[in-house]
Amino acid sequence: MKDTSSKRPKSKEANKKKTKDKSNADNLPKPEEAAASEPGHPEYIFPLVLTSVSQELFGCRADEDVTAENPHKLLKKQDIIQDLRHRAAVCDFSPVKQAVLDYPEDELLLVFDRDFIYGQSFYLVLTVQAKESILKPPAEGADEQMEDEEQQEEEEEMMTKTPEPQPWVSLGSERLVYTPSAVLSSVICVRQLRYSVCPLGRRSGTRVRFSDRNALDWKEELVECSSYEDKSFSITRMERDSSTQTCRDNTHTCTQTLWKKPKNMWSQYEPREFSSEEKQHQLQSENLKNFITSVARRFEIYLQQNLIADVFCDDWTALCEDDASLMGKTETQLKEYQSFMDLHFSKEKTISHVQWHPSISGVIVVSMMERLSLEERIDSSTKLLLNPSHILFWSFSDPINPQLQLECPDDVLCFQFSPSDHNIIAGGCMNGQVVLWDISAHVDRLQDTRSGGKNILNKLGKSDATPVVRYCAVSGIENGHKAPITDIQWLPETFEVNKLGTPVENQSRTSVQLVTCAPDCCVLFWDLRAPRVMVHSLTDIKQKQEEKPLENPHGVPNTFTHLNLTWKPFIRVSLPKISSSGEYSPLRFSMRENTVDYNTGDKSVSGADSRVFAQLRMQSAKQQKPLQNISTKLYIATEDGELVYTDWKVEKDNDSGRMLSAKPLDVFLLQDTLLHTVSRSPFFRDIILTVGRFSFSIWREGLTCGPLLMSVYSKSMFSAGHWSRSRPAVLFMGREDGDVEVWDLLQNSRQPSHTQNISTAAISCIRTQTSSGNTHPYTETLHTHTHTQPPSAAYAHRPAPVTHTHTHKHCTHTHTHTHTHTHTHSRHQLHTHTDQLRVLEERVREAKQNLLAVSDRLGTLHILQIPGSLRRSSSSERQNVEKYFEKEEERLQYFEKRQSDHQKKKKETEAEQQKKKTELVTPPKQEEEVNAETLKEYQQFLTLEKLILKDMNIQNETQQTCNTINTP
């Protein structure tokens, strides 16, 4: 029996792998090959720039000592170190100083790189292996012979040998075959093993060569277990159990009692009292005396405690007013809440004005205008007529599509909602016309946006297209402004103005007048009511009855049909200059908020429900009741940087008999450029903010010394400014570079407390969120109660009137009651009640006013969320701001007094000097006159001496002595 053995052939991949490993281990790549394969240079070389001095010093001059045929030069390590010591950083080998010091041998290889393969003319070899590989490259014949030997060995290994017969060698397996007791038999196959013994390369003296290896060939050396998709998770289920629920998890609802017709009511009642006999019996009873005696001491203690400390103070609310102080940091970053931009109406346009809807939360209105200069506007006038401008109503529920569009006859620069009816909007156009809109028919669409469009039943049968509302009336071009209207404001519903500018009582309690200004040097007053009905002839009445009503294809409301194209102002206030001829050019104006007048009578019941402007008529002069507590002063900002303080009343000229405007009361020149913002503080009626191109100022009405605060000149020009409605000390400023500055006057009045970039274009308008009637259901049921009651029991037997004033959302009611029973109240209860109401109002205001609208010149509206540190005010912030303004006012008055005293003293000094100059210079006296005066003085002295001697009885004795001496 013969055993045959054969060698198992190897695969081709293994042979290739082995060959590649050997080649990589034996061959070191040349620098040229490494430069071609890698983007930089290999790690074992360093490119150098050698100056001519260094080349001569080391004997490696280019194209002389080293050439392209013989580029190698061996440098001694000690010479390089010596050069580094002498020249230090000037030495060309200073970048590789550490590599030279760490080099193990005494000579380093320097190679001349004539072709600038590595970017420089020389490169230094930093390793010994690389130096040997460059100086002694392997011969091509030896490499080929080695490859042939390796290939021959591989072929021999792969060749299958034929088995040959061999003699039998007994190993004991035949015993198992012939043994009968063996149950199992096994056949043992013996194979001959072949071993290959090779000596170690380090002992045999074989040269070892290493080479670089490409990082992309790692797959041939490793076994990768790559990820794959598990099919067990891709099995589709034929059936699946699911459930749906139709009701919403959360819903916001509110309810409010509808009170259509408020009335003034009075009620009087008297408590039940004891009779005189019963009172006498109770006062003389022992029980009453014992009770008073037992509680008298405790009552005195309670009264003392009540006077010493406020027992009704809430320590928890007074503990910490700002949450940021607990966390140790204050958040001042404005976060973008939403942004609005329409691809059609906002393209190549800018936002000129922004207003929050006063009664519908989440709705904001913007006016769009063309971004053109005057010359471009004239050239494209035909295109502008075919594409009218619009005012867009945006809602938070739909940031892509506007909810409503108001068509405008021209670009609108400013607009305002009527304070009486928020569906009436007045706007000022660029051509000088005043426009009126009525959106009463589309209020439901705007109110549906508050629910996020979830009311599907109201949307059935309605189109998704944005409705376009045409203007109801427009003023005549010949009777209006001759320049673009830059500002417009409504007069409050508490008063109106007659033709002389005098405030009179508004019996209709409806805002029917508005004020506009333009750079045409005038301020105009407009009235929405029709003029008084005049006596018409029978022919005119018959002709009017025969006229057919005009068709209304656009569905324009007939609210202001009586004003369309015939509307003209009833007061024209001019602004003559004080010191020279000419007039001021107004851009913005600010009126004092005269919303309350205590001389005004009760609200007229007949005019309370009248909302049809066409039925309202102007009052006659006899029916008008003048009001004395209404301020008629205006602050006007001009395009020349002047702040004008004037009165809108007109006076009759005695010479010409014409109605003329008086000259302004004061004029302040602030800047050389225009003032684009004049705004009153929502917390202080007499504090005004003015913003120019380079700085802003804060003024107090009636103070003529100057501004309370004037900021330093800014590097970037200001383009907008606005007061914060939640904190009295905070201002928001917009700049031309798209940044928004936040100023906190209590923190730092010289620089902004926070600056943040909002847009890449200039900021055009800034508006904080105003109070909305439907913001929160709790705000609709808010009432303010003021109780005036006797503070002591001393009025127990005297009927005391108790007045309850209820301030509701739409009206004010006064109820007067007469109480005849005893009221015992503490003064702290009244203060506590007032403080609680104030805190409640501040919290409601905080919930509403946490958004800031910022628009830019590219037509984008940014809605920013105001952080809590800029939204919540402390309980004493208003008092601190007021004290700050008072100190600034005292400072101005002090400096004004010093200046006046200095000028007065200067005038007195000049007068004295002038007086001395005008006095005549007396000529010098003659010698005779001097002698005569001296003799006269001597005679006066002798006379005085005689009188003194005579009084002392010395003169007689002297005379007698003289006579005795003279007698013989």
Curated annotation (Swiss-Prot):
Keyword Repeat attached = yes
User: Which residues fall in a compositionally biased region of kind Acidic residues?
Assistant: 141-157
Cellular component aspect of the GO annotation = cytoplasm
Null phenotype? Morpholino knockdown of the protein results in a ciliopathy like body curvature. Morphant embryos show a reduction and dis-organization of floor plate motile cilia and a significant reduction in primary cilia of the dorsal neural tube. No severe brain abnormalities is observed.
**What are the ranges of the WD repeats?**
407-447, 480-536, 712-753
The record's Gene3D superfamilies line, in alphabetical order, gives: YVTN repeat-like/Quinoprotein amine dehydrogenase (2.130.10.10)
Q: Which UniProt keywords apply?
A: Coiled coil, Cytoplasm, Repeat, WD repeat
Annotated region described as Disordered, given as residue ranges: 1-39, 136-166, 897-930
Note the SMART domains from the entry. Answer: WD40
Q: Which GO terms describe its biological process?
A: cilium movement
Enumerate the subcellular locations listed in this protein's record, separating them with semicolons: Cytoplasm
Residue ranges, compositional bias (Basic and acidic residues): 1-33, 897-919
Where are the annotated coiled coils located?
Answer: 830-857
> What assembly does the database describe for this protein?
Part of the multisubunit axonemal dynein complex formed at least of two heavy chains and a number of intermediate and light chains.
As for what it does, the entry says:
May be involved in the regulation of cilia function.
What this protein is called in its record is Dynein axonemal intermediate chain 3
Q: Which organism is it from?
A: Danio rerio
